[in-house]
């Protein structure tokens, strides 16, 4: 059976439509403001060339905003980067799905494609504006969000260090409860997404830990026990010895959410549920607040240098984990392509085979969920593993708060019931899932 159609802005009034009409131009306007505001910095760093580059970038972004708002055709990329050809091939693929004479455009093409395309065009605008071609237009917002989340970060680092101090005294049941708690922290940390707030302040200002009980009813799919079962399969039944166990985390947002991912990764090692954790980040600035290698390393450095005992202890431990290769950071251009994940084996076989080495792959956040499910109009009750179509590299778990109108694996009637009481339940970030597929 063919999968359902892709979500797109052609459905007037849909979240995709409102995103392309309002939110994406708003993000682009913020990019224009940021670049313009840094004009003096570009001059200090690069002289007149920096000022000329700023003008070029502004002109590029203004033109891009106009193309979007007037539903112009999607254009090929011209920046000769490693992924340029793949993007242009994907544009040809999108053309091949249309009738003769039709062209992919902002409001007609799949939402997943045009939203990813906007961020790749932002990168193109910077790349084509040397000498500022390495500039991250979203870095200021990510840094600000990190510092505004300090109270919540301190609370979480303190909690982790206390937990590790008392670990020997915990029963197996207590350890399980602690892991469930940290999975929930990881889930609700995903609320902090600057691409949804249009780049406006969306930091975590209070400790999530005290709210977990009250948040629990809002977890629509809760596969935490099954996730733990997958992790517990690490003991060899004959010898009782622990096997090497690898967990991968495909990251979403920098800032507070990244700290929740680090805390979970630390606990997995401390509980001996994993012997190594592999993190996957983006190779370019993406979706306003997504984690790049710079954000990853910068965050650990900030914690190391913090004037707070437990924050700096966490930073030191995490740096050590990287040094000893208990933690490994990867980046791959596939994560910033528009492709659904069911195309990974064909488009990026090296990445697919890397994920096949994992015992559990955790996908954080909404964009990953959209790519896992193809961002299609699935019925709410379709099983998660079915919506993944051919993407089954390893047991995988999606941890996301809902901020896009795609959701599968719900019990019959739940989606309809929520619509009748809360029309925006799929986009508010109020509800979440911890959803597992063990199909391999």
UniProtKB/Swiss-Prot annotation:
<feature type="binding site">
    <location>
        <begin position="252"/>
        <end position="253"/>
    </location>
    <ligand>
        <name>substrate</name>
    </ligand>
</feature>
<dbReference type="Pfam" id="PF01937">
    <property type="entry name" value="ARMT1-like_dom"/>
</dbReference>
<keyword id="KW-0949">S-adenosyl-L-methionine</keyword>
<protein>
    <recommendedName>
        <fullName>Damage-control phosphatase ARMT1</fullName>
        <ecNumber>3.1.3.-</ecNumber>
        <ecNumber>2.1.1.-</ecNumber>
    </recommendedName>
</protein>
<feature type="binding site">
    <location>
        <position position="290"/>
    </location>
    <ligand>
        <name>S-adenosyl-L-methionine</name>
    </ligand>
</feature>
<dbReference type="InterPro" id="IPR036075">
    <property type="entry name" value="ARMT-1-like_metal-bd_sf"/>
</dbReference>
<comment type="function">
    <text>Metal-dependent phosphatase that shows phosphatase activity against several substrates, including fructose-1-phosphate and fructose-6-phosphate. Its preference for fructose-1-phosphate, a strong glycating agent that causes DNA damage rather than a canonical yeast metabolite, suggests a damage-control function in hexose phosphate metabolism. Has also been shown to have O-methyltransferase activity that methylates glutamate residues of target proteins to form gamma-glutamyl methyl ester residues. Possibly methylates PCNA, suggesting it is involved in the DNA damage response.</text>
</comment>
<dbReference type="GO" id="GO:0016791">
    <property type="term" value="F:phosphatase activity"/>
</dbReference>
<dbReference type="GO" id="GO:0006974">
    <property type="term" value="P:DNA damage response"/>
</dbReference>
<feature type="binding site">
    <location>
        <position position="252"/>
    </location>
    <ligand>
        <name>Mn(2+)</name>
    </ligand>
</feature>
<dbReference type="GO" id="GO:0051998">
    <property type="term" value="F:protein carboxyl O-methyltransferase activity"/>
</dbReference>
<keyword id="KW-0479">Metal-binding</keyword>
<dbReference type="GO" id="GO:0032259">
    <property type="term" value="P:methylation"/>
</dbReference>
<dbReference type="GO" id="GO:0046872">
    <property type="term" value="F:metal ion binding"/>
</dbReference>
<keyword id="KW-0378">Hydrolase</keyword>
<feature type="binding site">
    <location>
        <position position="403"/>
    </location>
    <ligand>
        <name>substrate</name>
    </ligand>
</feature>
<keyword id="KW-0533">Nickel</keyword>
<feature type="short sequence motif" description="Subfamily III RTxK motif">
    <location>
        <begin position="400"/>
        <end position="403"/>
    </location>
</feature>
<dbReference type="GO" id="GO:0008983">
    <property type="term" value="F:protein-glutamate O-methyltransferase activity"/>
</dbReference>
<dbReference type="GO" id="GO:0097023">
    <property type="term" value="F:fructose 6-phosphate aldolase activity"/>
</dbReference>
<dbReference type="InterPro" id="IPR039763">
    <property type="entry name" value="ARMT1"/>
</dbReference>
<dbReference type="InterPro" id="IPR002791">
    <property type="entry name" value="ARMT1-like_metal-bd"/>
</dbReference>
<keyword id="KW-0489">Methyltransferase</keyword>
<keyword id="KW-0808">Transferase</keyword>
<feature type="binding site">
    <location>
        <position position="257"/>
    </location>
    <ligand>
        <name>S-adenosyl-L-methionine</name>
    </ligand>
</feature>
<feature type="binding site">
    <location>
        <begin position="366"/>
        <end position="370"/>
    </location>
    <ligand>
        <name>substrate</name>
    </ligand>
</feature>
<keyword id="KW-0464">Manganese</keyword>
<dbReference type="GO" id="GO:0008757">
    <property type="term" value="F:S-adenosylmethionine-dependent methyltransferase activity"/>
</dbReference>
<comment type="similarity">
    <text>Belongs to the damage-control phosphatase family. Sugar phosphate phosphatase III subfamily.</text>
</comment>
<dbReference type="GO" id="GO:0103026">
    <property type="term" value="F:fructose-1-phosphatase activity"/>
</dbReference>
<dbReference type="GO" id="GO:0005634">
    <property type="term" value="C:nucleus"/>
</dbReference>
<feature type="binding site">
    <location>
        <position position="253"/>
    </location>
    <ligand>
        <name>Mn(2+)</name>
    </ligand>
</feature>
<feature type="binding site">
    <location>
        <position position="290"/>
    </location>
    <ligand>
        <name>Mn(2+)</name>
    </ligand>
</feature>
């Amino acid at each position: 059976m063919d999968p359902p159609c892709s979500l797109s802005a052609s459905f007037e009034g849909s979240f995709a439509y409102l995103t392309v009409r309002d939110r994406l131009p708003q993000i682009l306007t913020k990019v224009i403001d940021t670049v313009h505001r840094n004009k003096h910095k570009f001059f200090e760093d690069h002289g007149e060339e920096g000022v000329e580059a700023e003008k070029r970038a502004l002109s590029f972004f203004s033109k891009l905003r106009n193309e979007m708002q007037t539903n112009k055709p999607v254009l090929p990329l011209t920046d000769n980067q490693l992924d340029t050809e793949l993007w242009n091939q994907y544009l040809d693929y999108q053309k091949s799905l249309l009738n003769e004479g039709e062209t992919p455009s902002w409001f007609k093409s799949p939402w997943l494609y045009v939203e990813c395309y906007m961020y790749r065009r932002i990168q193109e605008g910077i790349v084509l504006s040397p000498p500022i071609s390495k500039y991250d237009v979203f870095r200021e917002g990510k840094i600000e969000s990190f510092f505004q989340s300090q109270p919540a970060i301190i609370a979480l680092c303190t909690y982790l260090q206390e937990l590790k101090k008392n670990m020997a005294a915990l029963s197996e049941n207590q350890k399980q409860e602690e892991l469930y708690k940290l999975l929930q922290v990881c889930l609700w940390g995903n609320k902090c997404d600057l691409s949804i707030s249009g780049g406006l302040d969306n930091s975590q200002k209070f400790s999530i830990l005290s709210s977990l009980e009250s948040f629990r009813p809002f977890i629509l799919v809760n596969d935490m026990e099954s996730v733990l079962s997958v992790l517990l399969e690490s003991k060899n039944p004959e010898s009782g010895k622990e096997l090497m166990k690898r967990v991968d985390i495909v990251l979403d947002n920098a800032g507070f959410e990244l700290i929740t991912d680090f805390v979970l990764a630390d606990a997995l090692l401390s509980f001996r549920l994993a012997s190594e954790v592999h993190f996957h980040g983006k190779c370019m600035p993406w979706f306003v607040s997504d984690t790049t290698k710079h954000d990853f390393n910068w965050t650990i450095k900030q914690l190391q240098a913090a004037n707070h005992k437990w924050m700096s202890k966490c930073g030191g431990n995490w740096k050590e984990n990287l040094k000893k290769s208990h933690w490994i950071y990867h980046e791959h251009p596939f994560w910033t392509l528009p492709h659904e994940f069911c195309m990974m084996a064909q488009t990026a076989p090296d990445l697919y085979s890397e994920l096949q080495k994992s015992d559990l792959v955790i996908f954080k956040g909404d964009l990953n969920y959209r790519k896992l499910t193809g961002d299609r109009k699935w019925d709410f009750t379709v099983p998660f593993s079915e919506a993944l179509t051919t993407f089954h590299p390893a047991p995988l778990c999606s941890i996301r708060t809902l901020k896009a109108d795609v959701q599968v694996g719900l019990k019959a009637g739940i989606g309809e019931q929520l619509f009748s009481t809360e029309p925006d339940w799929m986009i508010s970030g109020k509800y979440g899932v911890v959803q597992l597929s063990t199909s391999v």
